[in-house]
Structure formats: C-alpha cells, structure tokens
From Swiss-Prot:
SUPFAM superfamilies: Kazal-type serine protease inhibitors
Domain Kazal-like: 33-94
Biological process annotations from GO: negative regulation of acrosome reaction
Pfam family of the protein (one): Kazal_1
Subcellular compartments: Secreted
Keyword Glycoprotein in annotation: yes
Record: glycosylation sites: 55
Disulfide bonds: 39-75, 53-72, 61-93
Gene giving rise to this polypeptide: SPINK13
Name of the protein in its database record: Serine protease inhibitor Kazal-type 13
Keywords: Disulfide bond, Glycoprotein, Protease inhibitor, Secreted, Serine protease inhibitor, Signal
Major place of residence: secreted
SMART domains referenced in this protein's UniProt entry, alphabetically: KAZAL
C-alpha cells in the first residue's frame, strides 16, 4: 500500500507536464487579438526629455514597413513623425 500514493503523485506530475508541453505546441499565439500599444505611457510629459526605451526585443511592425525593437521605440518614432505611421501588428514586418 505504501507505493500507491507514489503512483498517484507520479501520474499527476506527468499529466500536468504533458498538458503544459502540448498546449504550447498546438496553441499558437494570435498576435491579432492583442491590444494596440498604449503610446501615452511612453511619451514624456516634458517635451525636452528624451524617452528612455528599455532594451527588450518584442518586435512591432509599423505601417511604413519598418520593424521596431519594441512598443516604446515605435511610439517614440510615431510621435516624431506626427502620427503618420500607424501600428500594423506585433512581430516582424513581412
């Protein structure tokens, strides 16, 4: 009877790991359902202050076909071009 709880624990751990492993394979991320960047949070209140964007790689594609490193770089560039470039999608441009 002492081995019975070990079998249950082993089964529960294996089934959990299997679920986690296969859920990432079959469910691809749908970037079209993600919200557009909230650029207000990246724009400094003082016009003389330069925005300090983090060095994080999370590509954003703009309407001009340029891929930006992340939302912050896109938002800063969008402000500098007086909002002529628009958000296209998350990920690299095709």
């Amino acid at each position: 009877m002492a081995a019975f709880p070990h079998k249950i624990i082993f089964f529960l751990v294996c089934s959990t790991l299997t679920h986690v492993a296969f859920s990432g394979i079959f469910n691809k991320r749908d970037f079209t359902r993600w919200p557009k960047p909230r650029c207000k949070m990246y724009i400094p209140l003082d016009p003389d202050y330069n925005a300090d964007c983090p060095n994080v790689t999370a590509p954003v594609c703009a309407s001009n076909g340029h891929t930006f490193q992340n939302e912050c770089f896109f938002c800063v560039e969008q402000r500098e071009f007086h909002y002529r470039i628009k958000f296209e999608k998350y990920g690299k441009c095709d």
